[in-house]
A protein has these predicted regions:
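Short beta-strand segments enriched for Tyr within beta-sheet-rich domains
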Residues: 155, 219-227
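Long C-terminal interaction/binding lobes of large macromolecular proteins
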Residues: 199
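Short Pro/Gly-enriched beta-strand edge/turn motifs at strand-loop
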Residues: 64-66, 194, 238-244
Length: 298
């Protein structure tokens, strides 16, 4: 059974923040589910998110194949940042799952923006960079940064005007239709908002379907909500009750391609991000190969 001792500088931390320190490869949503289900214990028994942590206390976690994979994984900050495209005004990097894009609670030091800033500092660049769109914490794929205020001012409106084509790969439970359009509204900030997603099945069997999806709107958790409502939640998605088998260390959702016109040069750009190794390896467990990822929705 994995266990950790609370050190002097960790006393008083929120339980989730403590666990993120100890298991940096684990998504916050996964750790929150462990706590919510009563799987994390201390000297007083089952711990809640509000339980105070005391110096010297032993924190016990359950035996779990998925947890062991997180514990064995390299910390995210030790993995080199992959640059997918760069010009004078634009930098596109391949975001792994887990790090937040911006500084936020639990991600003050290690977040994607901080990594990009560190990369440019190493080069001696003095550009002030900022991301111009977002990906959910557990989603991997290309993130577009503008170099300087003027570049950000030109790039941000591309997403607001929906001039960027966004493609995703997702593995979902069950056998879906071969292709279709999802138009059910999604809940965002307490309100139901219109959402539109096209999908095509790249591989299917009775257990699972590998889908390529194109987003026409950019609602938070759009793909996850719409597919779960159809009875096909994503593999690894605790929040929407997707299957979470031991061999899958994260949610199976990856942004695979961004297509847009460079507002500075006028050149058309198609930026592809390869399927992360941990997702590609898992596909064989559900009987799928890897020969179809380059196909696009027509």
């Amino acid at each position: 059974m994995p266990n950790f001792m609370v050190e002097k500088d960790e006393a008083g931390l929120a339980l989730i923040d403590f666990l993120q320190r100890k298991i940096p490869a684990a998504p916050a949503s996964y750790l929150k589910q462990l706590v919510k289900k009563g799987k994390v214990c201390g000297r007083s028994g089952v711990l809640t998110a509000d339980s105070p942590l005391l110096i010297g206390e032993q924190i016990h976690l359950p035996e779990s194949g998925r947890l062991q994979e997180f514990l064995a994984a390299r910390p995210m900050e030790s993995r080199p940042l992959q640059v997918l495209y760069e010009s004078r005004e634009i930098l596109v990097v391949d975001k792994p799952a887990a790090p937040a894009i911006h500084s936020s609670r639990g991600h003050e030091q290690d977040n994607l923006t901080a990594r990009v800033e560190a990369l440019l500092q190493q080069r001696g660049s003095k550009f002030k960079v900022a991301p111009v769109h977002r990906l959910d914490l557990e989603t991997s794929g290309p993130v577009l940064f503008g170099k300087g205020r003027k570049a950000c001012g030109e790039l941000g409106p591309l997403f607001m005007r929906r001039e960027v084509e966004k493609y995703y790969l997702a593995l979902v439970a069950g056998k879906t239709a071969g292709r279709g359009r999802l138009e059910s509204p999604v809940t965002a900030k307490g309100k139901r908002k219109a959402a539109c997603t096209d999908f095509r099945a790249l591989e299917r069997n009775e257990q699972a379907s590998l889908l390529e999806l194109e987003l026409h709107t950019g609602r938070q958790h759009q793909i996850r909500q719409q597919l779960a409502e159809q009875g096909h939640p994503l593999f690894g998605d605790n929040r929407y009750r997707g299957p979470c088998p031991p061999g899958l260390p994260r949610m199976f959702l990856h942004c695979s391609r961004l297509v847009f016109v460079d507002p500075f040069s006028g050149a058309p750009l198609a930026i592809d991000a390869p399927l992360p190794e941990e997702l590609a390896l898992f596909l064989s467990q559900v009987g799928f190969g890897n020969s179809c990822y380059s196909e696009r929705i027509e």
